[in-house]
Amino acid sequence: MAKKITAFIKLQVKAGQANPAPPVGPALGQRGLNIMEFCKAFNAATSKLEPGLPTPVIITAYSDRTFTFVTKSTPASVLLKKAAGVSSGSKRPNTDKVGKVTRKQLEEIAKVKEADLTAAELEAAVRTIAGSARSMGLTVEG
């Protein structure tokens, strides 16, 4: 018989830097999950990613206090800010432009995000990422 699921916990943790401090500790501790076991497993799973990039993770907690987790790709906004070399998006994206991204950069970001996007083709994924860039106040070139 399958284990009973008690909770889904969604967090954003920096790749390779999970530790028992907030937000990880309190979120797992209140469910009675082993915090250090998660930290070690998460850090091992994200060891190939660039350290420090925020990585969304969905933790499934079971009634016997075990867990499984799935990592997602880094949010598009973080990748776009990094590509454009800006620290934050524009407060008024329609009038104030804060940076530029090229078509090539959009394609690279779309390839990274490909598994998490619903787009059927790379071109559709690029258009989705370009829309995110425009809504952040970035100019899309190409």
Swiss-Prot record:
One example GO MF annotation: large ribosomal subunit rRNA binding
Any one GO cellular component localisation term in the record: cytosolic large ribosomal subunit
Transmembrane region(s): none
Taxonomic superkingdom: Bacteria
Record-linked CDD domains: Ribosomal_L11 (cd00349)
rRNA-binding among keywords: yes
Keyword annotations of the record: Methylation, Ribonucleoprotein, Ribosomal protein, RNA-binding, rRNA-binding
Any one biological process term the GO annotation gives: translation
Modifications after synthesis and translation: One or more lysine residues are methylated.
Subunit annotation: Part of the ribosomal stalk of the 50S ribosomal subunit. Interacts with L10 and the large rRNA to form the base of the stalk. L10 forms an elongated spine to which L12 dimers bind in a sequential fashion forming a multimeric L10(L12)X complex.
Family note: Belongs to the universal ribosomal protein uL11 family.
Function: Forms part of the ribosomal stalk which helps the ribosome interact with GTP-bound translation factors.
Name of the molecule in the record: Large ribosomal subunit protein uL11
Annotated source species: Xanthomonas axonopodis pv. citri (strain 306)
Gene of this entry: rplK
